[in-house]
């Protein structure tokens, strides 16, 4: 019940010092530094407490990662954290870690180096309250602990080559100062012997010619005989012939655009998904050069893109380097037996029986040898992680290429053939919108659809009866409807029946039906032979229409079909009208002529003929129903013409009678 609450830094520190990490995770270390900087002194205290717990861990990796994290905090989090590092708890934990015999040598070296650097850093602050770290440093130095400096970073191949070139240049300059251009081959002579030498030269010139092969030994003998008595105590030293040592073959310069391996010269942390993170000195295997500034590579078991400006080219490994790496790898795998032996020995020790590690010095030796293998094991883990990532990338590319190959080889999939004349159904979202637009703009006028003019006036053209669905598809546009409505309003008939808009306009979800009159020069009278189209609710009913039929009637009638008397009676009964019995309908306009043409027999004016009456009824029906065209008004009963020969000749007779 006295246990303290879990610190928010425990999880962060455990994650940053995980024993399974192959190397320090600097990204996690920076996250911890940022959090400590934002939390101030309280955050520094909690972070150092969490690090102190990790120092007591028995895994050397955890201890090394904890020391590295503490050093990162000391370099980035200011005076608050330096004060916590100078606390009694932290310095005591470091003292126990360094003086413990079970602590591995790499951990001791790193702890001693950090104690020295932290003591110097705290001393520079000048705060007298932070003297515990300096005291610890003095105590450890009094115990003859060696505070090794941090190991220098290994020189790169470029730096080694440059250093060798500078050394070779200095050596050549020293040799050039000692070299006199071959003058040491001649024997030194004092200035007093100049005359003798000149006289001897004259004697040589006046002497007879001697072969050159004999003259050279003679000249040498004369020079030696003259120089020997003149110079006393001088022994010419033999000339040192400079023989340059064979230099190591300079590694060939590798073009960055052709190199298969590159080394990072700057650390890089990716900001986007798919970017490769690496530290300075990491070797990256180049996999793809798809872009000019960004390449794809493998490093630390991951594959991603990296900036080209952050790396430098590496030459291919020489056979000697490959052999050394193979031998080192074989040594690591051969040491696995040592690790297994250490594990079995540790299992045989039981503290309950009183066994102690101090009684088994061989365990300490095996443990230290196993810890020394840790760095090599991590290197091999990175190597095989990169190879695994490369193989996975290769496998993915192979699967993609195999799929494309099969697709190209088998061809595109066959499209199922549709029957002839098949048209896929298409939705008509504007149908209801057009209908509602028509009814809302002109609610009092029934919508009509103009019929095209017939091309052959004397030929019977069958008008197909369309189904309601087809009528719905042939709904006129709003522009045509508005024009037809405007024309209907201009009709001069005073006896137009004003209908109720609610009764005249059909429901918005039902199609509109309209049977227009004939637009040809020959008027047609409907007949009952064709079935009457069903009228929607609320729409006015119209006379039944059918193609005209020729029947034998009384003389003087132009063969018009008499139609169905029962259908006409039903129509008049529905509208509350009476069948016409006179030649003039009451609803007929006064402007129409009252007399029949003279070409008609007088007996027809006073008598009632079925065809004549039906024509008058048809005219009355047209007077009650507004039509969208001025020419659609029916002709007078006396001037109705049929489609027969008699009707045509009768019209021609009237024209001849009334011609001016």
From Swiss-Prot:
<feature type="compositionally biased region" description="Basic and acidic residues">
    <location>
        <begin position="158"/>
        <end position="182"/>
    </location>
</feature>
<keyword id="KW-0813">Transport</keyword>
<keyword id="KW-0472">Membrane</keyword>
<keyword id="KW-0728">SH3 domain</keyword>
<comment type="similarity">
    <text>Belongs to the STAM family.</text>
</comment>
<dbReference type="InterPro" id="IPR002014">
    <property type="entry name" value="VHS_dom"/>
</dbReference>
<dbReference type="InterPro" id="IPR001452">
    <property type="entry name" value="SH3_domain"/>
</dbReference>
<feature type="domain" description="SH3">
    <location>
        <begin position="257"/>
        <end position="316"/>
    </location>
</feature>
<keyword id="KW-0967">Endosome</keyword>
<comment type="subunit">
    <text>Component of the ESCRT-0 complex composed of HSE1 and VPS27.</text>
</comment>
<dbReference type="GO" id="GO:0035091">
    <property type="term" value="F:phosphatidylinositol binding"/>
</dbReference>
<dbReference type="InterPro" id="IPR003903">
    <property type="entry name" value="UIM_dom"/>
</dbReference>
<dbReference type="GO" id="GO:0043130">
    <property type="term" value="F:ubiquitin binding"/>
</dbReference>
<feature type="domain" description="VHS">
    <location>
        <begin position="16"/>
        <end position="148"/>
    </location>
</feature>
<dbReference type="GO" id="GO:0043328">
    <property type="term" value="P:protein transport to vacuole involved in ubiquitin-dependent protein catabolic process via the multivesicular body sorting pathway"/>
</dbReference>
<feature type="compositionally biased region" description="Low complexity">
    <location>
        <begin position="573"/>
        <end position="623"/>
    </location>
</feature>
<feature type="region of interest" description="Disordered">
    <location>
        <begin position="437"/>
        <end position="660"/>
    </location>
</feature>
<feature type="domain" description="UIM">
    <location>
        <begin position="164"/>
        <end position="183"/>
    </location>
</feature>
<dbReference type="InterPro" id="IPR050670">
    <property type="entry name" value="STAM"/>
</dbReference>
<feature type="compositionally biased region" description="Low complexity">
    <location>
        <begin position="638"/>
        <end position="651"/>
    </location>
</feature>
<dbReference type="Pfam" id="PF00790">
    <property type="entry name" value="VHS"/>
</dbReference>
<dbReference type="Pfam" id="PF00018">
    <property type="entry name" value="SH3_1"/>
</dbReference>
<feature type="region of interest" description="Disordered">
    <location>
        <begin position="146"/>
        <end position="254"/>
    </location>
</feature>
<feature type="compositionally biased region" description="Polar residues">
    <location>
        <begin position="517"/>
        <end position="533"/>
    </location>
</feature>
<comment type="function">
    <text>Component of the ESCRT-0 complex which is the sorting receptor for ubiquitinated cargo proteins at the multivesicular body (MVB).</text>
</comment>
<keyword id="KW-0653">Protein transport</keyword>
<dbReference type="GO" id="GO:0033565">
    <property type="term" value="C:ESCRT-0 complex"/>
</dbReference>
<feature type="compositionally biased region" description="Low complexity">
    <location>
        <begin position="437"/>
        <end position="503"/>
    </location>
</feature>
<feature type="compositionally biased region" description="Low complexity">
    <location>
        <begin position="190"/>
        <end position="230"/>
    </location>
</feature>
<dbReference type="InterPro" id="IPR008942">
    <property type="entry name" value="ENTH_VHS"/>
</dbReference>
<dbReference type="GO" id="GO:0010008">
    <property type="term" value="C:endosome membrane"/>
</dbReference>
<protein>
    <recommendedName>
        <fullName>Class E vacuolar protein-sorting machinery protein HSE1</fullName>
    </recommendedName>
</protein>
<dbReference type="InterPro" id="IPR036028">
    <property type="entry name" value="SH3-like_dom_sf"/>
</dbReference>
């Amino acid at each position: 019940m006295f246990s303290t609450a879990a610190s928010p830094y425990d999880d962060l520190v455990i994650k940053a010092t995980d024993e399974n990490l192959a190397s320090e995770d600097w990204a996690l270390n920076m996250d911890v530094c940022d959090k400590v900087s934002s939390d101030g002194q309280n955050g520094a205290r909690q972070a150092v407490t969490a690090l102190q717990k990790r120092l007591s861990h028995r895994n050397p990796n955890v201890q090394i990662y904890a020391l590295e994290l503490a050093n990162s905090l000391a370099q980035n989090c200011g005076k608050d954290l330096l004060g916590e590092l100078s606390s009694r708890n932290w310095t005591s934990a470091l003292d126990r870690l360094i003086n413990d015999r079970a602590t591995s040598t790499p951990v001791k070296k790193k702890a001693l180096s950090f104690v020295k650097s932290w003591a110097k850093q705290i001393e520079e602050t000048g705060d007298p309250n932070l003297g515990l770290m300096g005291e610890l440093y003095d105590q450890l130095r009094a115990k003859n602990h060696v505070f090794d400096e941090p190991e220098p970073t290994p020189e790169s191949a470029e730096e080694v080559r440059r250093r060798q070139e500078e050394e070779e240049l200095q050596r050549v300059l020293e040799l050039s100062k000692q070299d006199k251009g071959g003058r040491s081959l001649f024997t030194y002579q004092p200035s007093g012997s100049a005359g003798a030498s000149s006289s001897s030269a004259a004697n040589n010139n006046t002497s007879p010619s001697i072969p050159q092969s004999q003259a050279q030994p003679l000249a040498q003998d004369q020079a030696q005989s003259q120089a020997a008595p003149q110079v006393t105590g001088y022994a010419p030293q033999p000339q040192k012939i400079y023989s340059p040592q064979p230099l190591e073959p300079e590694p060939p310069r590798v073009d960055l655009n052709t190199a298969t391996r590159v080394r990072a010269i700057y650390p890089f942390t990716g900001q986007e998904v798919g970017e490769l993170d690496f530290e300075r000195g990491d070797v990256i295997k180049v996999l793809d050069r798809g872009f000019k500034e960004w390449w794809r590579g493998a490093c630390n078991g991951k594959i991603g893109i990296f900036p080209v400006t952050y790396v430098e080219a590496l030459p291919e490994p020489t056979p000697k380097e490959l052999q050394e790496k193979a031998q080192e790898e074989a040594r690591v795998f051969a040491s696995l037996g040592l690790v297994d032996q250490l594990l079995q020995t540790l299992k045989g020790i039981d503290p309950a029986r009183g066994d102690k590690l101090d009684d088994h010095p061989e365990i300490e030796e095996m443990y230290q040898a196993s810890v020394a293998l840790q760095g090599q094991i991590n290197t091999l883990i990175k190597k095989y992680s990169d190879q695994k990532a490369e193989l996975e990338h290769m496998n993915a590319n192979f699967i993609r290429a195999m799929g494309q190959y099969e697709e190209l080889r088998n061809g595109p999939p066959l499209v199922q053939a549709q029957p002839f004349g098949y048209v896929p159904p298409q939705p008509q979202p504007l149908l209801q919108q057009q209908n509602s637009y028509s009814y809302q703009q002109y609610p009092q006028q029934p919508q009509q659809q103009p019929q095209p003019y017939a091309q052959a006036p004397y030929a019977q053209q069958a008008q197909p009866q369309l189904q309601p669905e087809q009528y719905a598809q042939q709904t006129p546009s709003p522009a045509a409807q508005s024009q037809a409505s405007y024309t209907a309003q201009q009709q001069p008939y005073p006896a137009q029946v004003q209908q109720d808009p609610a009764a005249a306009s059909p429901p918005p979800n039902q199609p509109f039906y309209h049977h227009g009159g004939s637009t040809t020069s020959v008027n047609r009278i409907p007949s009952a032979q064709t079935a009457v189209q069903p009228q929607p609710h609320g729409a006015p009913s119209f006379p039944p229409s059918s193609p005209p039929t020729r029947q034998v009637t009384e003389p003087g009638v132009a063969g018009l079909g008499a139609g169905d008397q029962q259908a006409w009676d039903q129509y008049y009964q529905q509208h509350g009208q009476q069948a016409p019995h006179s030649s003039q309908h009451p609803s007929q306009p006064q402007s129409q002529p009252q007399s029949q043409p003279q070409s008609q027999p007088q007996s027809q004016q006073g008598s009632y003929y079925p065809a004549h009456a039906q024509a008058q009824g048809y005219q009355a029906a047209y007077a009650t129903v507004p039509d969208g065209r001025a020419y659609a008004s029916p002709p007078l009963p006396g001037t109705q013409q049929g489609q027969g020969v008699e009707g045509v000749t009768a019209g021609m007779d009237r024209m001849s009678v009334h011609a001016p």
